[in-house]
Amino acid sequence: MARATGLSQTAVARIWRAFALQPHRTETFKLSKDPLFIEKVRDIVGLYVQPPDRALVLCVDEKSQIQALDRSAPVLPLRPGQPERHAHDYIRHGTTTLFAALDVRTGRVIGECHPRHRAQEFRRFLDTIDAAVPRHLDVHLILDNYATHKTAAIRRWLAKRPRYHVHFTPTSSSWLNLVERWFVELTEKQIRRGVHRSTRELIDAIRHYLAVTNETATPFVWTKTADEILASVARFCERTSNSGH
């Protein structure tokens, strides 16, 4: 830039700082094209900020293809001035899929692992949820638009259980499902830091994490209203449309 403009590197850097420009950085974005985007945002955020009485709100999803990875060298432990260190190379030992349902009110999670993530496994997880939640409560399920959540078998399962109410997130809007935030914590605190020499070791580690965190669970707090979210999306769309692209 300095060579192209005839300015010094110091001058270019000063201009970039003055206008908060960071040309070395890039980010990706994806906007939902769901025609019911506004209605779905209001519906789901309403469940977060004002959960219905005598009902459970469960954020449900699956974290698929979790790899059981063994490091090629022992993990070097944390030391003063030095973080825990892992070898870059690893050995794969298969994968598992975690199905999880986050209770919005308590922060506790119902979870189980399966080798695959088809509709059959999802229906079995719904059976697990049904056995775990009190019979006198209605259950509101927040789900994404993954095809396994909408098969005929799943629709029949739901039709036979009128206490269940399904709320689908808008397309391309996984950020609206709070269980995704829990998946981030699981990944950072357990999966990435662990050494798993088999899928059984990985599954045992996930189950242990579930048991320990459920003992001291606290709910995630949703802070933005639907109006604030929609206004933010509208501003972003306006900036994007005026960017000249």
Question: How should these model regions be labeled?
Answer:
Residues V57, L137-L141, F220:
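Generic beta-sheet signal
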Residues V109, V179-E201, V212-N214:
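Active-site proximal helix-loop segment of RNase H-like, two-metal nucleases, encompassing DDE(D)
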Residues L137-H149, S172:
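Acidic/histidine-rich, metal-coordinating catalytic segments
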Residues R3, E39-D127, S232-R239:
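Extended, low-complexity cationic-aromatic segments
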Residues M1-K33, L56, E62-Q65:
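Conserved short alpha-helical interface segments
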Residues D70, E201-H245:
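C-terminal domain-tail junction helix/linker
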Residues R85-Y90, L158-L178, G194-H196:
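RNase H-like polynucleotidyl transferase catalytic core
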